[in-house]
Amino acid sequence: MVRQSIGLIALQLLNLVSVAQAATDAKRDLSEKPKMPYDPNTAADCTWWIDNDGSKNCEDIPEYWDIEMVDWLMWNPSLTLDCGNFLKGRSYCVEAKSVLPTQTSSSTATTTSQKPTATVSPLPQQDGLTKDCTKYYNVQSGDTCQKIVDQYMTFSLAEFNKWNPAVGPDCRSLFVGYYVCVGVPGTPTKPIGPSPTQPGIPKSCNKYYKADRGETCQGIADKHRLKLNDFYKWNPSVTNDCVGLWQGYYYCVGITPAFELKAFYHADCTGKLHGQTTIASGSDGACFDTNCQVASIDTFIVGDCPNGQVQISYWEQPGCTGKWFGYGYSSRGTCRKLWTEGWKFKAVHLRCASEKDDCVSKRTCTYDPEPSRGICM
């Protein structure tokens, strides 16, 4: 009996020591002042900090310190909604005066999920950020728009600019410390295409080739019947002297066009074929001379125009010059009869665009009046 009592006491003492050690370890992780660098946008009234030594996951912190996920994200705006950007060697806030965590019993603590919801939108943000954003990124020093696109490889530069219009088309207004949108409903969650690849390959790439020892850019272009300039354009990291071509890496040798179409003499996409043109993905479109020989266009169903919408801009003279007669619209997989069946214009500019976004719809521009008679006589 005495031996059993002594053993029981020893076991209890061991448990107490373990609990005390765990409490001591927790205290070592917690401090009133940050010991590591921290984001300047962290809650200014933070009262307790943790130093990220890489031993814990971001998602586990709220439960470990008995705080709400929304508070954890609010106090540490450098973290993304999916708990990304939790950097080793940085300090993070786990209590602030602005919103103090409440102590709840274990029976009530499990009634809500610790995962952030789509309604939590981290700050600061720039004006105009898309309202349906589901994934955010905190801009770091040295970032560029293209660098962010290359980092995720799940969206194009055009999509990034659409979601974050305030950064500007030249990316001059990309501000360090601000959140930008890097995902909306439907955005892929994994990089597109094989691996490894170099940065800069367009999202519209639909055909890849693995470079072998001794190959050259010209040789790869010839093998796939490409123009060398197109190969360089689709694979900017190799540079125009091909010194960046690496053995074992995949390179883009084909892209999905924005759209492709055929132009016909009759208004129902029949009769003599005047020509066929392909508009490159990510471009601002191209001018197509009709020269009074085109009354309709048949747009292929394959392409990556948003919502399939194709803008047709009518011009008086070849080369898209002279008077401008406004816009018309078509969509992929559709035969479209052209304005005046081709008799009052000689060129069209074709590109991906939404009707609601054009200057006529917004009443910020005016087009020239329709000629009283055809100009093709």
Swiss-Prot record:
Expression triggers: Expressed constitutively with no significant difference during colonization of banana roots.
The species this protein was found in: Pochonia chlamydosporia (strain 123) (Metacordyceps chlamydosporia)
GO molecular function: chitin binding
Superkingdom of the organism of origin: Eukaryota
Transmembrane segments: none
Family annotation (Gene3D superfamilies): LysM domain (3.10.350.10)
Repeat is among the record's keywords: yes
Domain notes: The LysM (lysin motif) domains are small globular domains involved in binding chitin in eukaryotes. Lys2 contains one LysM domain.
Other facts: In plants, chitin acts as a microbe-associated molecular pattern (MAMP) that is recognized by lysin motif (LysM)-containing plant cell surface-localized pattern recognition receptors (PRRs) that activate a plethora of downstream immune responses.
Record protein name field: Secreted LysM effector Lys2
Compositional bias of kind Low complexity: 104-119
Signal peptide: 1-22
The family this protein is said to belong to: Belongs to the secreted LysM effector family.
Alphabetic keyword roster: Chitin-binding, Repeat, Signal, Virulence
UniProt cross-references to InterPro entries, sorted A to Z: LysM1-like, LysM_dom, LysM_dom_sf
Presence of the UniProt keyword Signal in the record: yes
One Pfam family here: LysM
Region (Disordered): 104-124
SMART domains: LysM (SM00257)
LysM domain mapped to chain residues: 135-182, 207-253
Biological role stated in the UniProt entry: Might have a role in sequestration of chitin oligosaccharides (breakdown products of fungal cell walls that are released during invasion and act as triggers of host immunity) to dampen host defense.
